[in-house]
Amino acid sequence: MKIGLMGGTFNPIHMAHLRIAEEARELCGLDRVLFIPVADPPHKPLAGEVPFHQRCQMVRLAIAGNRAFELSEIEGQRPGKSYSIDTIGTFREQHPQAELYFIIGSDSFLELGLWRRYADILRSCNLIVVERPGRQVNDPLSALPVDIRGELRYTPASRSLEHVGGTRVHFFAGCLLDISSSEIRRLAATGRSITYLVPPQVEAYIKEQRIYSECP
């Protein structure tokens, strides 16, 4: 079984998140894609301090009806900061025979060297790096810290990095939807429409709960 892991604050989840997950599922033949809201982001504070349960509910509403998409609340079940390597490790224990694919954006890949135990992430699962318009990764090896480069080989034809342990990093230019959660929060806070930026059921929930009514 191939399982995609897509983490994020999902504050809120929007149409580009869903499209990225669908393109990744199709590209790598994933059987399932798990959406994993971050409980306590390790690198920057959560904008607006939207509670974990509300962000989970927005994801739940957004993916309803898609049998390949699932919500995982695993990071809300652990104390402390939400580190990706811990989440990957838990799924590895739960699904020892599965192929895991960690889905991230190209901006996150370019900062991977700042992540906790980034080398173990590359060694323990496959990565799908989604390149947004204007954010291409032209030289993947050079983007990584020197101490890990010797374990990887880049194949231009397939646009992938192969780790000596067998895992791969796949790069693809996906999702032309240029949508940001921060812009959605700004629009919602000022009473502007967010229709077609988020699924209708998510928009209704945001309005009902007044989630971003006081967001900066």
Swiss-Prot record:
<dbReference type="GO" id="GO:0005524">
    <property type="term" value="F:ATP binding"/>
</dbReference>
<keyword id="KW-0548">Nucleotidyltransferase</keyword>
<dbReference type="GO" id="GO:0004515">
    <property type="term" value="F:nicotinate-nucleotide adenylyltransferase activity"/>
</dbReference>
<dbReference type="InterPro" id="IPR005248">
    <property type="entry name" value="NadD/NMNAT"/>
</dbReference>
<comment type="similarity">
    <text>Belongs to the NadD family.</text>
</comment>
<comment type="pathway">
    <text>Cofactor biosynthesis; NAD(+) biosynthesis; deamido-NAD(+) from nicotinate D-ribonucleotide: step 1/1.</text>
</comment>
<dbReference type="InterPro" id="IPR014729">
    <property type="entry name" value="Rossmann-like_a/b/a_fold"/>
</dbReference>
<keyword id="KW-0520">NAD</keyword>
<keyword id="KW-0547">Nucleotide-binding</keyword>
<keyword id="KW-0662">Pyridine nucleotide biosynthesis</keyword>
<comment type="function">
    <text>Catalyzes the reversible adenylation of nicotinate mononucleotide (NaMN) to nicotinic acid adenine dinucleotide (NaAD).</text>
</comment>
<keyword id="KW-0067">ATP-binding</keyword>
<dbReference type="GO" id="GO:0009435">
    <property type="term" value="P:NAD biosynthetic process"/>
</dbReference>
<keyword id="KW-0808">Transferase</keyword>
<dbReference type="InterPro" id="IPR004821">
    <property type="entry name" value="Cyt_trans-like"/>
</dbReference>
<protein>
    <recommendedName>
        <fullName>Probable nicotinate-nucleotide adenylyltransferase</fullName>
        <ecNumber>2.7.7.18</ecNumber>
    </recommendedName>
</protein>
<dbReference type="Pfam" id="PF01467">
    <property type="entry name" value="CTP_transf_like"/>
</dbReference>
